[in-house]
């Protein structure tokens, strides 16, 4: 009986191992996912369709004092290097360039060719000499390593369909002591928002630590800032967050 039990246990372990290997192979062969994301776990949450390039009219946002509140919370100072991810038409890019001044730099990133083109024209028209523009991909913002004091993601993180790959590629771009700033809305991910608990879980899975969280009406949502707190995990070691339609997040 004992020998039979050992045989069954060994067989069960072998089957489990084969299942893991098969799952890895399936992930690598899943052509519906970007090649650069296939080594990472898939997020178990719905994602909103990419919204328009203008979250709201710029004067309306200025009347609420949105950008000033966000930049104050993020402690954006002259001389800093800041990345504006999902820059769109450049609402934050323009205001960040004023805040960091001529000795600072702003890198504006987007994945939409039309937005990139329009933003390029705006930068040229307004002679924003301390702004650079790059085109990223949905799973990788393509930021240079060790370059930024702040990485800003305003009302766009909920549109990231490969969060584990995205944050893994993003993380090395921070300078020591740098922060990733997220401004978003507390609602399900398929309704153009992300619950804070799920946000914390996804960032935690990549070795980030929450350092500030504020909810303000001027933001039409909440502000969250993260710092690197541990080693960057290997893609295969990342533990995906369990979710219920993007409403919760626990590892």
Language model: regions and residue ranges:
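C-terminal motif of bacterial Sec signal peptides marking the signal peptidase cleavage site
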Residues: 21-23
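Class I SAM-dependent transferase core
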Residues: 25-83
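Short glycine-dipeptide loop
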Residues: 78-79, 102-103, 174-180
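Class I SAM-dependent methyltransferase SAM/SAH-binding core
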Residues: 83-141
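A short glycine-rich, Lys/Arg-flanked "PGG" loop and its adjoining helix->strand segment in the class I
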Residues: 97-98, 164-179
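A short acidic, Gly/Pro-enriched loop at the edge of an enzyme's catalytic core
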Residues: 139-151
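A short SAM/SAH-binding and catalytic strip from SAM-dependent methyltransferases
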Residues: 149-163
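Core SAM-dependent methyltransferase catalytic element
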Residues: 200, 210, 216-251
């Amino acid at each position: 009986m004992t020998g039979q039990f050992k045989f069954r246990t060994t067989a069960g372990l072998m089957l489990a191992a084969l299942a893991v290997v098969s799952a890895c192979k399936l992930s690598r062969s899943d052509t519906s996912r970007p090649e650069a994301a296939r080594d990472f776990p898939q997020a178990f949450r719905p994602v909103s369709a990419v919204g328009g390039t203008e979250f709201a009219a710029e004067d309306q946002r200025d009347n609420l004092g949105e950008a000033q509140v966000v930049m104050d919370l993020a402690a954006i100072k002259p001389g800093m290097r800041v990345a504006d991810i999902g820059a769109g038409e450049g609402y934050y890019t323009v205001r960040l360039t004023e805040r960091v001044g001529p000795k600072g730099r702003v890198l504006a990133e987007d994945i939409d060719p039309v937005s990139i083109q329009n933003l390029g024209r705006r930068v040229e028209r307004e002679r924003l000499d301390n702004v650079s523009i790059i085109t990223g991909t949905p799973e990788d913002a393509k930021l240079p390593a060790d370059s930024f004091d702040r990485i800003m993601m305003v009302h766009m993180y909920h549109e990231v369909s490969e969060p584990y790959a995205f944050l893994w590629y993003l993380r090395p771009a921070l300078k020591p002591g740098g922060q990733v700033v997220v401004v978003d809305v507390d609602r399900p991910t398929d309704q153009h928002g992300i619950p804070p608990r799920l946000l914390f879980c996804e960032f935690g899975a990549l070795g980030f630590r929450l350092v500030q969280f504020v909810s303000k009406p001027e933001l039409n949502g909440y502000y969250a800032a993260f710092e690197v707190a541990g080693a960057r995990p290997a893609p295969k070691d990342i533990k995906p967050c369990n979710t219920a339609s993007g409403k919760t997040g626990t590892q």
